[in-house]
Amino acid sequence: MKKTAKHFCPHCQKEVSWQDNPHRPFCSERCKMIDLGSWFSENYKIPGEKKPSEDEDDN
């Protein structure tokens, strides 16, 4: 018998079927979109040095 690992939705922590799941690693389209919204609203950030924006003058 093949042993399968348990996977959990990063947003709601429900157990997720990995195989044949079009939303993986999420459990649903809803959780996937909530996560995407968090990236867009900058709730999630990747650590590193801040680059100057194009609006800032280099003079």
From Swiss-Prot:
Give the residues the record marks as binding Zn(2+): 9, 12, 27, 31
Q: Which family does it belong to?
A: Belongs to the DNA gyrase inhibitor YacG family.
Q: What does this protein do?
A: Inhibits all the catalytic activities of DNA gyrase by preventing its interaction with DNA. Acts by binding directly to the C-terminal domain of GyrB, which probably disrupts DNA binding by the gyrase.
**How does it associate, per the subunit comment?**
Interacts with GyrB.
Q: Name one GO biological process term.
A: regulation of DNA-templated transcription
Residue ranges of coiled coil: none
The reply to whether Signal figures as a keyword in the UniProt entry is no
Cofactor dependence? Zn(2+)
Please identify the protein, giving its name as recorded: DNA gyrase inhibitor YacG
Q: How is the cofactor bound?
A: Binds 1 zinc ion.
Which molecular function GO terms apply here? zinc ion binding
Gene this protein is translated from:
yacG
| Cysteine pairs bridged by disulfides in the record | none
UniProt keyword annotations, A-Z? Metal-binding, Zinc
Question: What InterPro entries does UniProt report for this protein, alphabetically?
Answer: DNA_gyrase_inhibitor_YacG (IPR005584), Znf_NHR/GATA (IPR013088)
